[in-house]
Amino acid sequence: MNAENKPTNFIEEIIEDDLKNGLSKEDLRFRFPPEPNGFLHIGHASAICLNFGLGEKYGQPVNLRFDDTNPAKEEAKYVDAIKEDVKWLGYQWDELRFASDYFQELYDWAVQMIKDNKAYVDSQSSEEIAQQKGSPTQPGVDGPYRNRSVAENLALFEGMKNGKYGASEHVLRAKINMQSTNMLMRDPIMYRVVNRSHHRTGDTWKIYPMYDWTHGESDYIEQISHSFCTLEFLPHRELYDWFLDQVVDPKKIRPKQREFARRNVSHTVTSKRKLQKLVEQGVVNGWDDPRMTTISGLRRRGYTAAAIKNFAASIGIAKRDNLIDMNHLEFHLRDDLNKAANRVMCVLDPVKLVITNYPEGKEELLDAENNQEDETRGYRKVPFSREIYIEREDYKEQANKKFFRLSNGREVRLKNAYIIKAEGCIKDDQGNIKEIHATYDIDSKSGSGTEASMRRVKGTLHWVSASHALPVEVRLYDRLFTVPSPDTDKEKDFMEFVNPQSLEVVTAMAEPAMKDLKIGETVQFQRMGYFCVDSDTTENLMVFNRTVTLRDTWAKVDV
């Protein structure tokens, strides 16, 4: 085995062992099986990268299969959103499948199991079924309908299929072992009546298969060789195999279920119920709110597919659930955007600065490098004039030696422009600074080659020409929760940890070239972070989302 094909995790070791034991490489087939009842999140992204990554490594197909067995919660809009997310991550499935494609075959197999006395119709209430199943420390007991005749079971099951009965009258259960130490093996439900229209099959079916019955059989129909699930499905593996035993042809590939750990990201929640609560209570503005770790939210915030894939690759595949610091994801985002994003200047909290010795009415076009990491990006022209905007925090009337920005009597360089010295400021009646006065060194123009231009000063500030400034709306997004694990506190609801400062909206002043940016395009606001053009942008107002700061601002907070 060459180094390129050497296993990098225990999942690949499983596959390599199977290949050594006689499984043909051509028989490898994988799948990603989401339920279309919500939007995918960062945890799903890791599973997508795992399965499609295996397909790429071994050069074998990966199916996208929708586990659409619950018409009460599933919608076509989720199917479309999930397909878009997978494509955006850079993957292409081999076959698009739906569990609903197999409803007839699953039904036929269930009928055969009834005939083989391995399934029966139970007419108990859900409460009665739960009670007679026992507990982890107490074995279950046989229910009163467990030994119904085959003929009666067939008639009842057909009646369920034809809509003869209500939702709570009957269920079909597998006949396994009510004393099993694995409660999932205590005659699990295979079918229930659901009087709801299905997003694909309409009103054709009145009964719908349960997940455990559908999953393994769908894998078998598609001839999936390896079915990878998260750790909560480990107890389900015994049932997965038992159901396969009822239908498998030994001449065909028998799917193998194996489990890996969830990779949770700090300061987030991924439970669909909790994400739904955030949306419904107006904490966020929809499923694609840039504070959400849904794939659509991350995409809108300005995350790149490369950053998410590199993140997934870097944390690997584990056997124990773990919490990954959000900073690790942000590291890969910064690393990608540092190379991909052009630099621009935008002042988030502007205060006017007047260069008193610069000629009134004079304007210049200065050269500014688009990306110092990539010389091929070239330069752009940035207008300069007597009045400019700088960040309010970049000026203090009096400052100590550790303040390397602008203060009275001290010099700083304006990025791509001149060295200036602060002379004083004008304040309003409340004592707020409304205008700064400075002088410039006419010979210090950046790139001019003069001795003055090569003078070293400790601070460099970004700025925007006041007469050319483009007002823009900037949404300063931060982490949605104030603690790393908001949903693990046993005494407090996760909503109590919502960060009240997760969004601040400001009107900023941007250099005029930014008006040509397209929705979804990400740039670096120099010294401030990476920002993405939001879909709320209109012809009259550009809107930017803060994708990520230039450095981790939470490192000290979480210590």
Question: Where are the regions a protein language model picked out?
Answer:
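Secondary-structure transition/capping motifs at alpha-helix termini
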Residues: N21-K25, G53-P61, D85-E95, D116, ...
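Conserved short loop/turn motifs at secondary-structure junctions
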Residues: P33-P36, R65-K73, E95-Q104, E127, ...
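Long, charged, mostly alpha-helical binding arms that flank functional sites
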Residues: I253-H332
